[in-house]
Amino acid sequence: DGMLASVGDALHRSLGDLKLGATSSPLSSAPPVFAEMNPANSIKVAVVGAHLSGQPLNVQLVERNAALIETTRTAAGYRLYALANTSPPKPGLVFDGTGPGGIEVEIWEMEEGAFGSFVALIPAPLGIGTLTLADGRTVQGFLCESHAIRGAEDITEFGGWRAWLARSTPT
């Protein structure tokens, strides 16, 4: 039951700005439903762009019964770039030691057995590496090969992909 509730919750959140049931309360004010996973057999993955809740590739996490654990930020030293010629649009997170940090990420937890099929879907220049979070924890997460940021727009100042998308959308 817990796994099914978690999948339903993640799917509901991935649909965007929906209300909670028949109320006018936004879904985001409700805490996420967590699946009961064995921490010894699960992997925490930080996502930063098209895999965030409500974004086009979030379904790849939901299909693997991943559970949203929290939204947090990276440690200092990271920069975020809007990569050119990606579909759907994607950011690239790069550690260069100079970034102010504080890039928004979501931490998802998935069973070890689902991790390989998830990683196999990630196209270059993106990949999975170890990220340091603002509180000092380390998790696996999306990183970008440094050559891909040549000519890419540095969007670090926005603090995250969602904020950049919101600012770049015409009103």
Label every model-predicted segment.
Residues 42-55:
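Anionic-ligand-binding alpha/beta catalytic cores of soluble enzymes and soluble regulatory domains
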Residues 57-74:
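Short Gly/aromatic-enriched secondary-structure transition segments
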Residues 93-135:
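Mid-chain, well-packed structural core segment of small domains
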Residues 72-100, 108-110:
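Basic, polyanion-binding surface patches
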Residues 132-171:
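C-terminal edge-of-domain segments
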Residues 38-40, 48, 97-99:
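Domain-scale detector for complete catalytic domains at protein termini or as standalone homologs
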Residues 1-38:
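Structural helix-boundary/capping segments
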